[in-house]
Amino acid sequence: MKIIGLDFDNTLTNYDNLFYQTARDLALIPQNIKSEKVAVRNYLKSINKEDEFTFLQGKVYGERIAEADQAKGMYEALIDLQCKGYKLKIVSHKTKYPIKGYKYDLRKGAIEWLSKNKFFNKNGLNLKRDDIFFESTKELKIERIFKEKCEIFIDDLPEILNLIDPRIDRILYSPKNDNNKYNFKKIQEWAELISILD
């Protein structure tokens, strides 16, 4: 049984709408900003309010994470993988609390999102809590991927994939296809995953 490791933030989840809505609710951005995390960040940076974005991240990843969308087609793709005999493990670089702002328990929030989205349901993905790992540093994340014997790892950050042992099959999830300088296998949509593994 092959083990597939999965990143969490911006790989299983899509925060674009939630970043936009939370920033609007806090009156941090005008309405005409694009409903994307990057657009919100770039706007706040352009008006010298980068600290507000750091605060916003804590809100989104903590207090409001339950409102985050699934990455399009992700859940169906993971069901397909399980049907083909793959074992799923989630390995995320996620600190317990945000860098700034209120001390939301980010890991607890992520578990609640996974629960809400049927990752633990017997009639869903039926993952166990010990299939989920949150690590405090990128280095510990890389170690965990190795310890859990992941043969494949999917992440939205090429800098993470660059650190992973090249004997592990590394797949870059890049919905906007904006990481062309990297030679990893790449998917823009989760629906493409099965075809590049077969």
Task: Give, region by region, the residue ranges found by the protein language model.
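Short catalytic/ligand-binding loop motif for oxyanion handling, primarily in non-cytosolic enzymes
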Residues: 13-15, 97-101, 141-143, 161-163, ...
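A structural signal for isolated positions on well-ordered beta-strands in alpha/beta enzyme cores
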Residues: 87-89, 131, 152, 169-171
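Substrate-recognition "cap/lid" segment bordering the active-site pocket of phosphatases
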Residues: 96-150
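Substrate-recognition element of Asp-dependent hydrolases with the DxDx(T/V) motif
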Residues: 65, 74-111
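Active-site neighborhood of HAD-like aspartate-dependent phosphohydrolases
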Residues: 1-52
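Metal-dependent phosphoesterase signature
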Residues: 29-30, 38-79, 86
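Acidic di-acidic motifs
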Residues: 7-9, 137, 155-156
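Asp-based, Mg2+/Mn2+-dependent phosphohydrolase catalytic module
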Residues: 146-147, 157-198
